[in-house]
From Swiss-Prot:
Catalyzes the hydrolysis of diacylglycerol in vitro and may function as a key regulator in lipid metabolism, namely by regulating the intracellular levels of diacylglycerol. 1,2-diacyl-sn-glycerols are the preferred substrate over 1,3-diacyl-sn-glycerols. The enzyme hydrolyzes stearate in preference to palmitate from the sn-1 position of 1,2-diacyl-sn-glycerols. Maintains the functional lipoylation of the 2-oxoglutarate dehydrogenase complex (OGDHc) through its interaction with the OGDHc by preventing the formation of lipoyl adducts. This is sn-1-specific diacylglycerol lipase ABHD11. Keywords: Hydrolase, Mitochondrion, Transit peptide. Phosphorylated. Gene3D superfamilies: alpha/beta hydrolase. Residues 1-22 form a transit peptide.
C-alpha cells in the first residue's frame, strides 16, 4: 500500500519549526557570497513510500511552484514503478523556510543535506524549470548522489522566454488584499488584478496557489523580496566546468521556447550522455499539460 509521509528537516540548531505560520518562517542568513559555502535551510517535503530497491524519484518544482505541482504524477509513478517518490518545496517556496539567498548553489546545498538524511541517494532527480537547473547543478557538483537526471523544459542555456517573470513578481506585490474577508474573496481579487499583466489563466492559477491566510491576513507564501532581488541568478545558470556522465534526459514541451534543439551542443558539453525528447502539444509545464505523455517518457527513460 502506498503511504504519504510528511516531514521537515532542520539541519542547523536554531532553525525552529514555524507550524503553518508562513509570516514567521525563519530567515537564514545568506552565505553564498564571496565563495563561502551556502547555509542550507529547512525544506518541506512529502515522501511516498515504495517497496522497490530501485533509486527513488525526486521531483523539484519550478519558480513560483511547490511540491503539490507533482502530486498526481508522483502518486501515479509510485504506483506504477513501486519506487519511493519525494516531492520537495524549494527554499522561499511552498512551506519551506525563507532565506535571502536564492542562488542555485544554495538550492543545491539544501538537497545535498536533505537527500542523504532521508536515505534517498543515489536518486533519480527530476526537475522542472528552476528545479531542473537545481538538479543539473547538483548532478555536476555531487554526481555520486544522482543515479540519473531528467531536466524538464530547461537547460543551462539562457533564453528570453522568462522575460515576463519580473512582471509577475511586481503584479503580485501590487495586489492589496487588506480588506478581503475570505480566502476565496482574496483569490478572486488577486486574479482580477493579475489579469491585466498575466493573460494566461493557467499561469494565474499557478500563482494563486501561493495565496494563504496567516493570522487573519491574506499573503503570498512566496518570499517575493528574495525572488525579486535574485531573479537574475535564477534566470542564469552558474558557469561550470565539471561534467555529469550519468544518463540524462532533457524533456521539452513541443510548444515551449525554454528548451530548444539548438541548445543540444551546449547541453552535451556538460552532460555528454544527454538525450533530448519532445512532448508534442505541451507548453512549459509539460507535466501539467500532458501528464500521461510525461510519465511515459519518464518510465521509458528509467527502463
Amino acid at each position: 500500500m502506498l503511504r504519504w509521509t510528511r516531514a521537515w528537516t532542520a539541519p542547523y540548531r536554531g532553525i525552529g519549526l514555524s507550524n503553518s505560520s508562513f509570516s514567521r518562517l525563519p530567515i537564514a542568513p545568506s552565505s553564498s557570497q564571496g565563495g563561502t559555502e551556502p547555509r542550507p535551510v529547512r525544506l518541506s517535503y512529502k515522501l511516498l513510500d515504495g517497496e522497490a530497491a530501485s533509486p527513488a524519484l525526486v521531483f523539484l518544482h519550478g519558480l513560483f511552484g511547490s511540491k503539490t505541482n507533482f502530486n498526481f504524477v508522483a502518486k501515479t509513478l509510485a504506483q506504477q514503478t513501486g519506487r519511493r517518490v519525494l516531492t520537495v518545496d524549494a527554499r522561499n517556496h511552498g512551506e519551506s523556510s525563507h532565506s535571502p539567498d536564492m542562488s542555485y548553489e544554495a538550492m543545491s546545498k539544501d538537497l545535498q543535506d536533505l537527500l542523504p538524511h532521508l536515505g534517498l541517494v543515489p536518486c533519480v532527480l527530476i526537475g522542472h524549470s528552476m528545479g531542473g537547473r537545481t538538479a543539473m547543478l547538483l548532478a555536476l557538483q555531487r554526481p555520486e548522489l544522482v543515479e540519473r537526471l531528467i531536466a524538464v523544459d530547461i537547460s543551462q542555456v539562457e533564453t528570453t522566454s522568462s522575460s515576463n517573470f519580473p512582471n509577475y513578481i511586481a503584479a503580485m506585490r501590487a495586489v492589496d488584499m487588506a480588506n478581503e474577508a475570505s480566502l476565496s474573496g482574496a483569490r478572486k481579487l488577486a486574479d482580477e488584478r493579475l489579469r491585466s499583466v498575466i493573460q494566461s489563466a493557467s499561469i494565474r492559477q499557478l500563482l494563486l496557489t501561493n495565496l494563504v491566510e496567516v493570522d487573519g491576513r491574506f499573503v503570498w507564501r512566496l518570499n517575493l523580496d528574495a525572488l525579486a532581488q535574485h531573479l537574475d541568478k535564477i534566470l542564469d545558470f552558474p558557469a561550470r566546468q565539471e561534467t555529469y556522465s550519468g544518463p540524462t534526459l532533457f524533456l521539452r514541451g513541443g510548444n515551449s521556447q525554454f528548451l530548444l534543439p539548438s541548445h543540444y551542443p551546449e547541453i552535451r558539453r556538460l552532460f555528454p550522455r544527454a538525450q533530448m525528447q519532445t512532448v508534442p502539444n505541451a507548453g512549459h509545464w509539460v507535466h501539467s499539460d500532458r501528464p500521461q505523455d510525461f510519465m511515459a517518457a519518464v518510465q521509458s527513460f528509467l527502463a
